[in-house]
Amino acid sequence: MLNMKSFALLMLFATLVGVTIAYDPNGKCGRQYGKCRAGQCCSQYGYCGSGSKYCAHNTPLSEIEPTAAGQCYRGRCSGGLCCSKYGYCGSGPAYCGLGMCQGSCLPDMPNHPAQIQARTEAAQAEAQAEAYNQANEAAQVEAYYQAQTQAQPQVEPAVTKAP
């Protein structure tokens, strides 16, 4: 375990050599502390965790401080965007999807554009897979019948001569 003095020295050293430590050992998050571990959200009070106390807060947009273009602040994004596990704001499965979101996640907002987009993309992928399976099955049936037709001996009808 690191004591505070060791931790401070480690942070100073990391800053001097240009290394950043991804996670705060005390579970804090936000601009000063960094991001939460995968699967966790940054609460409105700047602590990492999971569940509605951490992930379902509604920080007013005025409290979300501007950051570098497209980056999250305390696990939150303005404009209704999701904060990805990598600390960037956006919409769609890469930002809002299960296991991809660290904050401003939208599991309980089924009509949010990002959720609609994620469902639409999933439905399109499922429809494409179904169409492929049906086409593949039809091709297999056609090949089977062609093989059966070619394998059967051709019998010519008997020709009868008139007396």
From Swiss-Prot:
Residues 1-22 form the signal peptide. Pfam families: Chitin_bind_1 (PF00187). Residues 26-66, 69-107 form the Chitin-binding type-1 domain. Expressed in roots, flowers, stem and leaves. PROSITE patterns: CHIT_BIND_I_1, CHIT_BIND_I_2. Residues 58-67, 100-163 form a propeptide. GO terms for molecular function: chitin binding. Keywords: Antimicrobial, Chitin-binding, Disulfide bond, Signal. InterPro entries: Chitin-bd_1, Chitin-binding_1_CS, Endochitinase-like_sf. Disulfide bonds join C29-C42, C36-C48, C41-C55, C72-C83, C77-C89, C82-C96, C101-C105. The keyword Disulfide bond applies. It comes from the Eukaryota. Induction: Weakly induced (up to 5-fold) by infection with phytopathogenic fungi like R.solanum, F.culmorum and B.cinerea. This is Antimicrobial peptide 2. It comes from Stellaria media (Common chickweed).
